[in-house]
């Protein structure tokens, strides 16, 4: 929920497109995350669901959604649990996904991190959870020990250097970026083709209506719409449905 097609590269593309539409410098660092998936997730549950009525979630739940990633510190203990759980989840699950895909094996993971975290995903999750429970009880806040946090961040840095920033996914990023820009530019100039449910809010901000629409697409759906809009077809109607 809230995540753009193609992950964080789609998020960056929408931030760039919105900045340009508003006459702002897209290369200014403060405009890099005009569109942020965690804020979009909160927007969905507060304003977009149920025809604009929202889901009537508690402050703690929305706090966890809004602050689950990035540098925002959650106001509530529940929100801080979500944030630290998110980091545990993507580090451990991305390792599992990479191993299943044959992109890395356990022995290539940083030794110093494995010595603290453990040598398998179940072991790593168990050790981190126990560490959080113990340290949180000790300090009266939701927290890992410094040694466990450093080990987790070492593993995260390894994944960024050897998985996220290399390989097929990285090669495809420029194409995904351009695709999102193209979709935004098309629909912001053809608002009549944006589905009605996305036009019930922000009447004076068509860029937000379009961002709501595009960010809710799956990778496959975004690609299919792009093909319909930009690639020639022999006779026939567009495949996508408004």
Residue ranges and their predicted role:
Residues 1-31, 38:
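Aspartate-rich (DDxxD/NDxxD/DxxxD) Mg2+/diphosphate-binding motifs
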């Amino acid at each position: 929920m809230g995540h753009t097609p193609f992950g964080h590269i789609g998020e960056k593309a929408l931030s760039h497109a919105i900045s340009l539409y508003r006459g702002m410098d897209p290369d200014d660092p403060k405009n890099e995350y005009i569109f942020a998936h965690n804020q979009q997730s909160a927007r969905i549950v507060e304003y977009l669901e149920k025809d604009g009525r929202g889901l009537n979630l508690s402050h703690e739940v929305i706090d966890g959604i809004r602050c689950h990633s990035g540098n925002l510190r959650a106001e509530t203990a529940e929100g801080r649990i979500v944030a630290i759980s998110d980091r545990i989840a993507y580090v451990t699950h991305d390792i599992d996904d990479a191993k299943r895909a044959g992109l890395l094996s356990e022995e290539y993971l940083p030794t110093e991190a494995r010595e603290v975290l453990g040598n398998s995903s179940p072991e790593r999750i168990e050790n981190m959870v126990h560490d959080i429970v113990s340290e949180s009880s000790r300090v009266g806040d939701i927290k890992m020990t410094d040694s466990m946090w450093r080990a987790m961040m070492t593993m995260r840095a390894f994944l960024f250097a050897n998985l996220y920033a290399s390989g097929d996914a990285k090669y495809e990023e420029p194409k995904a970026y351009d695709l999102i820009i193209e979709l935004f530019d098309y629909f912001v100039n053809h608002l009549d083709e944006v589905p009605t449910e996305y036009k019930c809010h922000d009447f004076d901000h068509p860029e937000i209506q379009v961002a709501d629409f595009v960010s809710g697409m799956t990778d496959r759906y975004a690609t299919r719409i792009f093909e319909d809009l930009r690639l020639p077809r022999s006779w026939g109607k567009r495949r996508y449905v408004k």
